[in-house]
Amino acid sequence: MKTKTRFGVLICNQLSKMGKNQKDLAQESGLSPFYVSEILNGKHNPSVRAVYNISKAIGISIEELTKTLLDES
């Protein structure tokens, strides 16, 4: 089983600080819970739209999220 990526860890840490979970993120970002899980666990690369929606939902800039993604590749 693959561990969370730095991208996934960053998002999960922010969700924890906000008292929210993946289901909340899915609802607030307009993404399916399955897609959110796949992204956070590194099984699926997020689309630009998904990164944008996630950034708005958790209050982290799209630049920071994108940098984290680029650092992993």
What are these language model-derived features?
Residues 43-56:
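Short, basic-rich loop-to-helix N-cap that marks the start of a DNA-contacting helix
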Residues 1-21:
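A short, Lys/Arg-rich alpha-helix, primarily the initiator
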Residues 20-38:
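Short alpha-helical DNA-recognition segment
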Residues 19, 56, 64-73:
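Short, charged recognition helix plus adjacent turn
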Residues 15, 26, 55:
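The alpha-helix within a helix-turn-helix
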